[in-house]
Amino acid sequence: MTFRMPPEWAPHERTWMAWPGPNATFTDAEELAGARAAWASVARAVRRFEPVTMVHGPGQAATARELLGPDVDLVERELDDAWMRDIGPTFVTDGRGGLAAVDWVFNGWGAQDWARWEHDAEIARHVADLAAAPVLSSPLVNEGGAIHVDGEGTVLLTDTVQLGSGRNPGWSREEVEAEIHAKLGTTTAIWLPHGLAGDYGRYGTQGHVDIVAAFARPGTVVVHSQRDPRHPDHERSQLYLEILRGRTDARGRRLEVVEVPAPTVLKDEEGEWADYSYINHYVCNGGVVLCAFGDPNDELAAGIFRRLFPERTVTLVDARTIFAGGGGIHCITQQQPRT
């Protein structure tokens, strides 16, 4: 039986998320409260368009319900962190109404010294069980934020994730591609050399592609474009644009590359180079939930996404607190396709 990962814009059954609890990312009560408010804002925005299930840790149901309201489903499971894109399963379908869940190996984004993943490594199987989806186990260390597909055979990847020594030492590029293609039903991999500069900080993923580039439809990719030469991502984004403009997808189409200007802010509240990116958005049934940063370019980005998704409502949600923890809106959501 052949499975494939549908594109994010295909119809969803629901969205899965994970509720923030006390951990290495949210180290004090103020940070945790801010994270929970931010996650709740995203969940409520997505719930306008489709069902949402929030996985929460023991004893956290009351707080979750208070912030999420009555319309988000709650499920209790042990968690280490709250990035469902990475710890949850990658759902795939067989085109005949069958659903399955790819369970990648999760090791804390390359076995980082601060990360704990005893419970998160099991979440993909828990979610698959709740979705009544058989599990397709993979030996590849990988996360959902490290892949993006067009639904027609093409997948975006980055060298520093799948080929990184902390994840898959000893794997060749060809071996990684073979495993990705076998699980996602893809045939063509487009590799970028790395992620944004800020993604290599203490709580970074070491190069996830979903903050850099994403398919908006077959043949069209949105790309983070840092226009300010003072920012280290200026040179990086120029390289991404050059690579993607020179590539063709699985159908032989030369990619249409849509530049999405980065926010104008250059440094975050900690004084570090900001990796704020509008690329880390989430497409759901009838909607696009887009990161906002209190920045003049927020509405510019919203306009670009409205043109790309004219049939969907674009909703801006402040994502600065999420980015402070190491990710964005796409990182905390995981779609279950409708079958």
Swiss-Prot record:
SUPFAM superfamilies: Pentein. Keywords: Hydrolase. It comes from the Bacteria. The active site is at residue 331. Its EC number is 3.5.3.12. The keyword Hydrolase applies. It is an enzyme of class 3 (hydrolase). It catalyses: agmatine + H2O = N-carbamoylputrescine + NH4(+). Coiled coil: none annotated. One of its GO terms (molecular function) is protein-arginine deiminase activity. GO terms for biological process: putrescine biosynthetic process. PANTHER family: AGMATINE DEIMINASE-RELATED. Belongs to the agmatine deiminase family. This is Putative agmatine deiminase. It comes from Streptomyces coelicolor (strain ATCC BAA-471 / A3(2) / M145). The gene is aguA.
